[in-house]
């Protein structure tokens, strides 16, 4: 075994050197805090090995917020470099590494875990399930994601980050990118992608088989509908990515030639593989985001969602078309007029079902009794901003015009107007909206609104000038420019906008910390002044009981809970409760994640034997699990009755208080 020790440390960059010095102290400090407060046993037994979908969801969200910080720092470094002409703040290769990792982190390790966290917390509650279909697999999926996240972030201080862009095109990512950087990209995304594929299968089966029997597909809440359709995209889109990553890994480590022209390979094969996954990936994160908006807008408009069935069909239409547009990402690569024309038309067609959704949200708002809580503000801001992203997308869909726009900042502005307003706004809105369901108290609304205004205004100040920069010819991925180019003022404005966005995010962090100590606790579960419309608001707050529902709820309309409250009925009346069967926690996912992290690290540095040993460790863990006799455990009926009685008493007090105020 010849480990390449000479590649381990990145040298010659003061910023990376500071990170290399600071990272060990950060890890030691974290270990010291956990040890001092004697939290190791608690964390291992209650969180790391938990199969409770709600706790797994919270772990996803914690990781997503941390990756938001990391990706945001990358973005600020990019803007700092481009603020003034001929800047020497970053050298070219380091700049390439930063924009490459920024894209991967924000899409793979921020947006997706944010969405998966909300899936885990909300979807089983919305369909009346006690857990997901495969609780152990859910735990394994999280740790696979976590292993990929850790590996990818190690690249900054050990070995060097990938510098071939988030698309990692061959041959740039092949013979022109020596060292472990691209290997980090391939292995980390491969491991995380396996967890994503498992999550997609898990939630597909959960929604199909674990929903309450009286709930029909067209009666499901829109967040659950968009989740179900998204799982189909995950199941169909991730295998091509898995194959592509595996092929490029063998090219780099075992000297095959799938993407190397000199030996008969096809670099364009990578582009097709990548975007067959890459464009559906956009809808993997944006369709659940549409589902979030479809929950928030009716809640704070105090109206039924307009055109529920058309929203379902529009979601299905977008999912179908998402697999027919991938070539628009490389119109400029010589496909020919006929192929470009087909994919140009199919790209424009996506605007039709998306337009249906936009009009339905607007008609839901029409004559509604709207209140402007912070989740609603994000949802309202999404509509006009996303529309701008969509209109510029149609401009880019015109293949002939795309030759002018494609490699400029016009494209950068376009996809940020779609992904930030479509996904990031939704993630922040969803986090605030369902935060009481996780923690039992609302985040401070004043701080939330400061977060919204800084983030939304900063976003437009940052990215609107980039449309003009693109039309003025500024290429994307450019690490510096000359004063004579005339781009200084717009780049300065763009950087100011990025700083405003960072301040907005800091307000959210302050809100989380402040609310932990100051916000009043709520036990009733229907936390937004009794405006909840779906099943999750019928359960207790502060991580609902492990069993979620003491009895199987009835559900015959997507607004059933509103009807029940109007008629004074709820699910918490006295019942003859029975013992409830639940799955046991398991360490399997945690140890598979550890083996994956260690094995992946050795494979990144092309040291195969230790990686194989870790692979045997993974198989051994799986064999150990297969021979376990684990029948789970039962929550006694008396304990269920006591828990439900407390919740019923809290609900009665809430209704009495509301009646007294009125």
UniProtKB/Swiss-Prot annotation:
- Record SUPFAM superfamilies: Cytochrome c oxidase subunit I-like
Compartmental location: Cell membrane
Q: Where does Cu cation bind?
A: 279, 283, 328-329
Q: Name one GO biological process term.
A: oxidative phosphorylation
Q: Where can the 1'-histidyl-3'-tyrosine (His-Tyr) cross-link be found?
A: 279-283
What does the Swiss-Prot or TrEMBL cofactor note state?
Binds a copper B center.
User: Source organism's superkingdom?
Assistant: Bacteria
Binding positions for Fe(II)-heme a?
A: 102, 416
Record field: transmembrane: 14-34, 58-78, 103-123, 140-160, 187-207, 228-248, 273-293, 311-331, 336-356, 376-396, 415-435, 451-471, 493-513, 587-604, 608-627
The protein's matches in PROSITE patterns, at most eight in alphabetical order, are given as:
COX1, COX1_CUB
**Residues annotated for heme a3 binding in this entry:** 414
The record's listing under PANTHER family reads: CYTOCHROME BO(3) UBIQUINOL OXIDASE SUBUNIT 1, CYTOCHROME C OXIDASE SUBUNIT 1
Can you say what this protein is called?
A: Probable quinol oxidase subunit 1
**Species of origin:** Staphylococcus aureus (strain NCTC 8325 / PS 47)
The taxonomy runs: Bacteria, Bacillati, Bacillota, Bacilli, Bacillales
């Amino acid at each position: 075994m010849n480990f390449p020790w000479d590649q381990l440390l990145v040298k010659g960059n003061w910023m990376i050197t500071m990170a290399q010095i600071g990272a060990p102290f950060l890890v030691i400090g974290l270990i010291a805090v956990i040890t001092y407060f004697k939290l190791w046993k608690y964390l291992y037994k209650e969180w790391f090995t938990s199969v409770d979908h709600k706790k797994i969801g919270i772990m996803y969200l914690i990781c997503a917020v941390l990756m938001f910080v990391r990706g945001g720092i990358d973005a600020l470094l990019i803007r700092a470099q481009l603020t003034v002409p001929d800047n020497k703040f970053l050298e070219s290769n380091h700049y390439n590494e930063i924009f490459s990792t920024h894209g991967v982190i924000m899409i793979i390790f921020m947006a997706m875990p944010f969405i998966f966290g909300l899936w885990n917390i909300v979807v089983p509650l919305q369909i009346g399930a006690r857990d997901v279909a495969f609780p152990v697999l859910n735990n394994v999926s999280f740790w696979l994601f976590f292993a990929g996240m850790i590996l990818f972030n190690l690249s900054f201080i050990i070995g060097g980050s990938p510098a071939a862009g988030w698309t990692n095109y061959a041959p740039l990512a092949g013979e022109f990118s020596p060292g472990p950087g691209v290997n980090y990209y391939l292995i980390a995304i491969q491991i995380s992608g396996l967890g994503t594929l498992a999550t997609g299968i898990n939630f597909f089966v959960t929604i199909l088989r674990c929903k309450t029997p009286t709930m029909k597909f067209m009666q499901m809440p829109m967040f659950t509908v968009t989740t179900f359709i998204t799982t189909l995209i995950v199941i169909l889109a991730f295998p091509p990515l898995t194959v592509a990553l595996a092929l490029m890994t063998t090219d780099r480590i075992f000297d095959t030639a799938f993407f190397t022209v000199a030996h008969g390979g096809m670099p364009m094969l990578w582009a097709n593989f990548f975007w067959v996954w890459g464009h559906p990936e956009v809808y993997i994160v944006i369709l659940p985001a549409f589902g979030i908006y479809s929950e928030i807008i009716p809640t704070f408009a105090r109206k039924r969602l307009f055109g529920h069935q058309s929203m379902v069909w529009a979601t299905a239409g977008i999912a179908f078309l998402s697999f027919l547009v991938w070539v628009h990402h490389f119109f400029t690569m010589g496909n020919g007029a006929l192929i470009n024309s087909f994919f140009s038309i199919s790209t424009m067609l996506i605007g039709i079902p998306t337009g249906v959704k936009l009009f339905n949200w607007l008609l839901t708002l029409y004559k509604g009794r709207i209140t402007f809580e912070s989740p609603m503000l994000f949802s309202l801001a999404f509509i006009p901003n996303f529309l701008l992203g969509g209109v510029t997308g149609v401009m880019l869909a015109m293949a002939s015009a795309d030759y002018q726009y494609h490699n400029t900042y016009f494209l950068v502005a376009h996809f940020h107007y779609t992904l930030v307003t479509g996904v990031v706004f939704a993630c922040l809105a969803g986090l605030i909206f369902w935060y009481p369901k996780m923690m039992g108290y609302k985040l401070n609304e004043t701080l939330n609104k400061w977060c919204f205004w800084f983030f939304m205004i900063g976003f437009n100040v940052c990215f609107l000038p980039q449309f003009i920069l693109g039309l003025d010819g500024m290429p994307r991925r450019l690490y510096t420019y000359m004063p004579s180019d005339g781009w200084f003022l717009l780049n300065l404005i763009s950087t100011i906008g990025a700083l405003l966005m960072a301040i907005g995010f800091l307000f959210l962090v302050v809100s989380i910390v402040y609310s932990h100590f100051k916000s009043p606790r709520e036990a009733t579960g229907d936390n937004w002044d009794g405006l909840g419309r779906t099943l999750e608001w019928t359960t207790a707050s502060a991580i609902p009981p492990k069993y979620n529902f003491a009895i199987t709820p009835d559900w015959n309309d997507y607004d059933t809970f509103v009807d029940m409250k109007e008629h004074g009925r709820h699910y918490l009346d006295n019942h003859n409760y029975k013992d409830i069967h639940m799955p046991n926690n398991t360490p399997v996912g945690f140890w598979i994640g550890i083996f994956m992290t260690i094995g992946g690290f050795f494979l990144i540095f092309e040291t195969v034997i230790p990686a194989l040993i870790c692979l045997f460790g993974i198989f051994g863990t799986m064999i150990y699990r297969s021979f376990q006799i684990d029948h789970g455990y039962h929550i006694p009926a008396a304990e269920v009755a006591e828990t439900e009685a407390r919740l019923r008493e809290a609900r009665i007090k809430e209704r009495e208080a509301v009646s007294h105020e009125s």
